[in-house]
Every structure is written in C-alpha cells, then in structure tokens.
C-alpha cells in the first residue's frame, strides 16, 4: 500500500484592485478556515495559476502576505494571467520554485507543469519539447520506482494548443492517479476512462456558488475530491477508499470494484471522537483510527452482495456519501477504449454533494471578458 497524499486547492485567485481585491479577501478567509481545521491532515497547499489578475508587483505582494497565514508547504503554478507581461518574473514573489519541477511527497511523485511560458500569452497553452521529454522521463522513472503519480497544471490537456492528445496519452499510459487543474472557474471532475481530472471553483471572479477550496486525497492511488465552501460546517468527512463509481478507472482493482469483503477508509478533517460507517443506510459500524496516518479512519465489511451500494461515513453531524459497485463471482465491468483523453467531454456531470452543479459556468466556456 502506497499510503495517503492529501492537498488543499485554492482556486484561481484573480487578485485585482479593480474589484476591490475581492479575490484576496476571500483567500484570506479561506486560509483562516484551513489553518483552524486541517492541521497535519494535509500535506501541502496548491495555487493552480491566475494568481494575480494582471501580474503586478503589488498584486503579488498582497498574495504573498496572505499566504503567510497558512502553515503548510505551498506549490504555485502560473496561469495565463500571470504570464500577462510575457514572463513570470513578478510571480517569483510568491514562490521560490518555478515549474516544471517534481517532488516525491508521501510516496507519490508529484509533477508541477508550466503550460504558459511556451505560448504567446492568453490561453495559448503549450508544452515545449524539452518539458515534454522531461515529463516522459519523470513518468518512466516513477513507474520503475513504483511511485504513483499526481500531475498539476493550469488547464486540462485538452486545452493545449499543441499535441493535447499526446500529453493526455502519456498520462493514461502511465496510469497517472490524478491531474489537478485550475482555469475553468468552476468545480468539475473528468473521468476519461484512464485518468481522473479535477478543476476547482475560482476564488475571484466566481459565477457559481460561494468561495471555497477543494481537498483531494489519493489513498493507495484511489482519488477522492471534496469541495468545502467558506461557511460549510466542520468536521469535513471524505471517504477515500474504495472509489466512488463515478471515479472508477480500473475495474480490475479491488479498491475500484470491490468484492463482498472490503475495507472502507475515510479522512475526517477537524475534531473527531466517534466515526461510523453505514452500508445502504444500515446500522452503524464503528470506525477506528489508522495508526501513522493523520485523520484517517477505517472499518471492514463482509457479505456485501453484487450490485450498487451506498456508503455513508458520519462524524459529529457531518457525513460523506459515495456509491460503489460490488462484484463477487460475476464478470467485472469492462473498460471501454478511451475517447478524447484529457478533454472535458468526459466530465462526470453534476454531483451536488461535491459542490459540482455540472453547468460549467465560467468565462472560458461562455466568452466573458475576464
């Protein structure tokens, strides 16, 4: 078992004096909430790009000051707005590391990509040949080392202007566990049959719902994703294994499509004394803390029949729900040939419990001048 990797994703900030620094004030409120409740349960924080709306020194200085409020390591990507002056010099005020680079975190190889510097500005997203070769080397090295991979980039591969299918094909061939992105301005999950992609609602320039952040966990390579709005109650419960039916990428894996006996794991962010599992709204099954993994709880079940089942984990008035597919002796689901890898045609649609309404309300889809 690889273990758990968890990060918090603050959506595109778009910090700008033109709106009275609305994105910045929201960012500060979200940081305060995260600092109060997440603690050691999270490995790092991500900014996915479009941090400063016009890439000015003053905008970055204000962002850097706000970032001091969170005692987690930061990883910061560039978006098209950060590249507005045709370079990323000013962005160095908020990060000492400029993508592309890779780190191994909690047993996972994490690749942080630059998709703006090779372009001409705006949404001219590109990956130059040197970075492409580097990505291939990193993926191959991780495979040899037995390290599952997470990738972080400003936009989906389908938004690249050069070889989007080739990049997404690399991710699929190497079984990347999760690709985390910004750019959309809305919450979304894609499942292209090989890789799960996520995008998180922007912090500034929101067209849907309240500001918030997403929490992503990879549990032995199984991805789970939850959105926490700024005024949502705590604790936050996140079932991390097995996979929800919407996020199945490999039906042959027992943590994607389990048999009659399996273990359920969940993370609880915030104070937790008693955590319970319920199968198909049945009686409470006590969960126990997992030694050595902060905030992770587990319980085992047996005798579950074939078919669709509902899992609920509850803690202090909060809960998480997923649907799972169980197969025992019967044939396992087939995995169809992939179509349109890394493109939002593979969006899973609305998942209201996750803060995903499926409407794709954002300027990049609807032509607004942001």
What residue ranges belong to the model's regions?
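Extended active-site neighborhood of metal-dependent phosphoesterases/phosphodiesterases
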Residues: 56-145, 163-178, 184, 188-226
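Active-site glycine-centered loops adjacent to acidic/histidine catalytic or metal-binding residues
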Residues: 12, 49-50, 79-80, 154, ...
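Aromatic sugar-binding surface patches on proteins
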Residues: 72, 290-300
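Binuclear metal-dependent phosphoesterase catalytic core
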Residues: 195-281, 296-328, 332-335
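Solvent-exposed serine/threonine-rich low-complexity stretches and specific carbohydrate-binding patches
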Residues: 282-292
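N-terminal active-site segment of His-dependent metallophosphoesterases
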Residues: 1-62, 352-370
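Serine/threonine-biased, Pro/acidic-interspersed low-complexity stretches characteristic
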Residues: 220-224, 316-370
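Short acidic, glycine-rich surface-loop motifs adjacent to enzyme active sites
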Residues: 48, 139-159
């Amino acid at each position: 078992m690889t273990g758990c990797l968890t990060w918090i994703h603050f959506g595109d900030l778009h910090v700008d004096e033109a709106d009275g620094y609305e994105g910045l004030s929201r960012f500060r409120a979200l940081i305060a909430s995260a600092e109060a409740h997440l603690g050691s349960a999270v490995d790092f924080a991500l900014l996915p790009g479009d941090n400063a709306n016009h890439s000015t020194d003053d905008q970055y200085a204000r962002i850097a000051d706000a970032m001091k409020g969170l005692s987690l390591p930061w990883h910061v990507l560039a978006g098209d707005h950060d590249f507005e002056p045709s370079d990323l010099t000013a962005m160095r005020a908020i990060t000492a590391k400029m993508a592309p680079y890779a780190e191994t975190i909690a047993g996972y190889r994490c690749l942080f990509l630059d998709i703006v510097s090779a372009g001409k500005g705006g949404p001219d997203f590109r990956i130059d040949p040197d970075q492409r070769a580097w990505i291939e080397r990193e993926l191959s090295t991780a495979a040899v080392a037995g390290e599952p991979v997470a990738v972080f980039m400003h936009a989906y591969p389908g938004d690249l202007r050069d070889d989007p299918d080739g990049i997404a094909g690399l991710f699929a061939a190497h079984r990347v566990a999760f690709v985390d992105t910004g750019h959309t301005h809305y919450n979304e999950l894609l499942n292209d049959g090989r890789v799960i992609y996520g995008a998180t609602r922007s912090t500034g320039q929101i067209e849907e719902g309240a500001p918030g952040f997403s929490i992503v966990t990879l549990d032995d390579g199984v991805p789970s994703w939850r959105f926490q709005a700024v005024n949502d109650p705590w604790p936050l419960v996140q079932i991390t294994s097995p996979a929800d039916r919407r996020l199945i990428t490999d039906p042959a894996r027992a943590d994607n499509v389990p048999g009659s006996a399996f273990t359920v794991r969940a993370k609880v962010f915030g104070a937790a004394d008693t955590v319970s599992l319920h199968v198909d709204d049945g009686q409470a099954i006590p969960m126990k803390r997992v030694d050595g993994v902060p905030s992770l709880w587990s319980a085992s079940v047996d005798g579950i029949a074939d078919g669709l089942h509902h899992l609920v984990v509850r803690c202090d008035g909060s809960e998480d729900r997923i649907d799972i597919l169980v197969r025992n002796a019967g044939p396992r689901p087939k995995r169809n040939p992939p179509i349109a890898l890394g493109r939002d045609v593979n969006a899973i649609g609305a998942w209201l419990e996750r803060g995903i309404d499926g409407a794709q309300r954002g300027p990049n889809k609807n032509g607004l001048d942001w």
